[in-house]
Swiss-Prot record:
Maps to a phosphate-starvation-inducible locus previously known as PsiC. PANTHER family: MANNOSYL-D-GLYCERATE TRANSPORT/METABOLISM SYSTEM REPRESSOR MNGR-RELATED, TRANSCRIPTIONAL REGULATOR OF 2-AMINOETHYLPHOSPHONATE DEGRADATION OPERONS-RELATED. Residues 36-55 bind DNA. Pfam families: GntR, UTRA. SMART domains: HTH_GNTR, UTRA. Residues 8-76 form the HTH gntR-type domain. This is Putative transcriptional regulator of 2-aminoethylphosphonate degradation operons. One of its GO terms (biological process) is negative regulation of DNA-templated transcription. NCBIfam families: phnR. Signal peptide: none annotated. Keywords: DNA-binding, Transcription, Transcription regulation. It comes from Salmonella typhimurium (strain LT2 / SGSC1412 / ATCC 700720). GO terms for molecular function: DNA binding; DNA-binding transcription factor activity. It comes from the Bacteria.
């Protein structure tokens, strides 16, 4: 939008006012913002300006958009300590959040080239590929691809995979996650993950890649996770 030289653009002023209301607690986690039309009336401006203000707040991780429902104040981020042996469901409950995992697909397929080496497989070996969506308090926060070894977990697809995979491993195979190699870095949200999470393709995301080991020190599976950029923080205490 045009502005007088030296003046702060109106969309930044509106962003600052909304940000102040969020940070002061006047707008709390999970609160719904007024509609774009209502915000136009409140700030006496155009919808284009309001949308720019909202986009700035979304990029900052302060608000998020739910399809056909509007804009909401972003919940507090889940925090992950990579030194702790935990799983998504346990992590959520320990932080007072309600977890849910939904299985999108589960197939026996040829191992993708990019995970062949860490899983110690050969070309054309088979894996179970699970694609799952994880929710915290009803909000989709993570798109996960689980690459599982049929030799370690035969007939895996016969079980209910809409919950904790950790519990399935323990109850049906007597296998326990005990250690992992974790890498994480920012990336752009790929198309399939973006569609599942309800965000635009190419939006910022946090990618976590975990190579998991069981109680015998053997490779168990490999997870590739795409997290919404506003839903997770990683903390490590080295004391």
């Amino acid at each position: 939008m045009k502005s007088i030289p030296g003046d702060i653009p109106q969309y930044l002023l509106i962003k600052a006012q909304l940000q102040a209301r969020i940070q002061s607690g006047a707008l709390k986690s999970g609160d719904k913002l007024p509609s774009e039309r209502e915000l136009c009336a409140i700030f006496n401006t155009t919808r284009i300006t309001i949308r720019e203000s909202l986009a700035q707040l979304e990029s900052s991780g302060l608000i998020w958009r739910a399809d056909r429902r509007g804009w909401f104040v972003t919940p507090e981020r889940l925090w992950l300590d990579p030194t702790q042996n935990t799983n998504f469901h346990k992590l959520c409950r320990e932080q007072g959040r309600e977890p849910k995992t939904a299985l999108l697909s589960g197939v026996l397929t040829t191992v993708p080239v990019e995970v062949m080496e860490p899983l110690q497989l050969q070309p054309f070996d088979q894996i179970y590929l699970l694609t799952r969506l994880r929710y915290a308090d009803g909000r989709a926060v993570c798109y996960c691809e689980n690459h599982c070894l049929p030799a370690r977990v035969p007939e895996l697809l016969q079980y209910d995979l809409n919950g904790s995979l950790t519990e399935v491993y323990e109850s049906h195979y007597n296998l326990v996650y005990t250690s992992m190699h974790l890498s994480f870095y920012p990336t752009a949200m790929p198309a399939q993950a973006a569609q599942a999470l309800g965000v635009m393709e190419g939006r910022p995301a946090l990618l976590l890649r975990r190579l998991n080991y069981d109680q015998h020190g053997r490779v168990l599976d490999l997870d590739i996770e795409y997290w919404r950029h506003d839903s997770l923080r990683i903390e490590v205490d080295t004391h």
